[in-house]
Amino acid sequence: MENGGAGTLQIRQVLLFFVLLGMSQAGSETGNFLVMEELQSGSFVGNLAKTLGLEVSELSSRGARVVSNDNKECLQLDTNTGDLLLSEMLDREELCGSNEPCVLYFQVLMKNPTQFLQIELQVRDINDHSPVFLEKEMLLEIPENSPVAAVFLLESAKDLDVGINAVKSYTINPNSHFHVKIRVNPDNRKYPELVLDKALDYEELPELSFILTALDGGSPPRSGTALVRVVVVDINDNSPEFEQAFYEVKILENSILGSLVVTVSAWDLDSGTNSELSYTFSHASEDIRKTFEINQKSGDITLTAPLDFEAIESYSIIIQATDGGGLFGKSTVRIQVMDVNDNAPEITVSSITSPIPENTPETVVMVFRIRDRDSGDNGKMVCSIPEDIPFVLKSSVNNYYTLETERPLDRESRAEYNITITVTDLGTPRLKTEHNITLLISDVNDNAPAFTQTSYTLFLCENNSPALHIGSISATDRDSGTNAQVTYSLLRSQDPHLPLASLVSINADNGHLFALRSLDYEALQAFEFRVGASDHGSPALSSEALVRVLVLDANDNSPFVLYPLQNGSAPCTELVPRAAEPGYLVTKVVAVDGDSGQNAWLSYQLLKATEPGLFGVWAHNGEVRTARLLSERDAAKHRLVVLVKDNGEPPRSATATLHVLLVDGFSQPYLPLPEAAPAQAQADSLTVYLVVALASVSSLFLFSVLLFVAVRLCRRSRAAPVGRCSVPEGPFPGHLVDVSGTGTLSQSYQYEMCVTGGSRSNEFKFLKPIIPNFLPQSTGSEVEENPPYQNNLGF
């Protein structure tokens, strides 16, 4: 009985839902299928494709699936063949109770585009239940004066089957007093009445009994039996009469248990026990017996179980009043259940797609259906989502909704959405239901790697070891997964003369930069190149950055003395007159340093001297000057060692050796002016005289006298011959060139300081530059020396 009541409740819900469905789906295609109950799971129901006129391939490509209203999966669809199969054994009595026909409604959900097709599955009854009497023994008390053809009620049998398989007829054992007559009640169920064929005589037969048999219409038919005992009583010739033949009442579905529904009342004209009335439900269904209770004495009908308008909207109850003599009267009570807003909306999810790509608008995220079991405004619903999210709800047929993206999403801004779908009814008070989903956004390669800096400046000391880590670059990608994996590379240099591949390398995984070989500041002070960062997306995205490498100078070059040149040939001798004043400029030590900056700042100091204190060296310019007055006691020859030191760390140095000759009566040298042409002519005559004198080697004494005379004559003349110094001619080594322009000399010089011989005019050359520039291409050329010349005084 309980299963039957639940089935009736479900059937009423299904019928109500599909009445609304039929109104909203007018004109849509419907597939009708028929199946017998109790078939095994996997049994063939029908071919959906043929019934609806669809292609089998369309079912598979559009992801067709069967969706039921109560979320039960009774059917399954084979998308490869289009066949509908049973997912479970169907029990018609459990599904529909006593309702006939038993029709189940399903929808076929198809995507791209979203479409709903209706399926009606009629479950046909089989004769799997026998009629059953609730009371195995019935007791009837019949007055002896009951007229022939008097009718007496018998309890009906219950058969869960319907249609032809339900109870069809009743029979009793053949006897001379009674026969059975079959009646049909308002709900089309048959019940038996016992008809008196022959008057009863209490004195002759006070009691008799027979078997009541109920037969259904199945093949073969099933039956059930009960024992009927008839007790003959004395005369009771008045039946009870109700005050109203029909009662109609209304009751709210949320009424509390024990509430009084209605009171029925009847009377009997008899007296004594024959007028004592007893109220009962006549042939009431199980739902009625579970929900209501009648007081047999007072006729009060009270509520014993909760009401549910959505399950049963009304009850029709036959009330029987029976007197003490067995006579009865009947009345009908109709109880109308009034709906209250006691059901919150329901959400049934059909499909959810997560994660979804970030760059695809109008993507269907979720398909769901809403419903409210209430009626009227209580069953009207409003569906909504928060306004601050890029999603939109679109309604479809039969209260189906789709949740779609409103615009392209950006995973880098937000990778996850927690969406709350709220369904609110319009009843009083309003009830709502919320459904939360978490939606993940999958990454699309829409962000190129970004360097932390647009340009990088790296510093590297020269003379580095190969494979030295000189710095790192870094780029980040806002994407995720393989789209965020960055690979670094060197880009082709725009300078065709820069051998970038032999200078640096880069680790493709972490961006570490390495120097491939040792660098020389004097050859390469700086260079720049571009690096690229590419991700692993499809298509791959990339970006570039500029890298500048500045080579830092190391103190790896010692000072080089340009003058006096230390080449192992005849030493350079400087002549100083004994009459020179303190601070007299003897000579200037000229040196350069191939380094730059502080490493090329040179300082000079006198390291050794034949006579300390006689000469001094200026620290910043290398000038060698006399420190005091010269005297006759000072030696004629002096050897000076000048130390040239740079300002590097550690400092490097070089030495220059000078020979100084003190000469008596030696005037200051000067360069002849253009107006001194007559004096030059005298110098030429004197040269001829000296050559002749030197050719005369008659005696050493004569040579000494002539030498003394020559010296005297030189003092008087304006010619300014000085000592001889042989310096090589030709280019200097190219590594002495200050390539950066920041060295000690911006231009390198070679000096020639001697008196030329073999010339008709005694031309005196003093610190004349003979090499204007040091060129890099002269590196490694040999140094040539001019043969020493002697002036006509023999120095």
From Swiss-Prot:
Domain spans labelled Cadherin: 35-133, 138-242, 247-347, 352-451, 456-561, 568-671
Q: Give the species this sequence originates from.
A: Pan troglodytes (Chimpanzee)
**GO CC: one term?**
plasma membrane
Alphabetically ordered keywords of this record: Calcium, Cell adhesion, Cell membrane, Glycoprotein, Membrane, Repeat, Signal, Transmembrane, Transmembrane helix
Q: Which GO terms describe its biological process?
A: cell adhesion; homophilic cell adhesion via plasma membrane adhesion molecules; nervous system development
Q: List glycan-bearing residues.
A: N418, N436, N567
Name the predominant localization.
membrane
Role, per record: Potential calcium-dependent cell-adhesion protein. May be involved in the establishment and maintenance of specific neuronal connections in the brain.
Q: Which PANTHER family match?
A: CADHERIN-87A, PROTOCADHERIN BETA-12
One Gene Ontology molecular-function label: calcium ion binding
Bilayer topology term? Single-pass type I membrane protein
- The signal peptide here is 1-26
* Annotated localization: Cell membrane
Segments on the Extracellular side according to the record's topology features: 27-690
Where are the bilayer-spanning segments?
Answer: 691-711
A Pfam family that the UniProt record links to this protein: Cadherin_2
| Record's protein name | Protocadherin beta-12
Residue ranges, Cytoplasmic compartment? 712-795
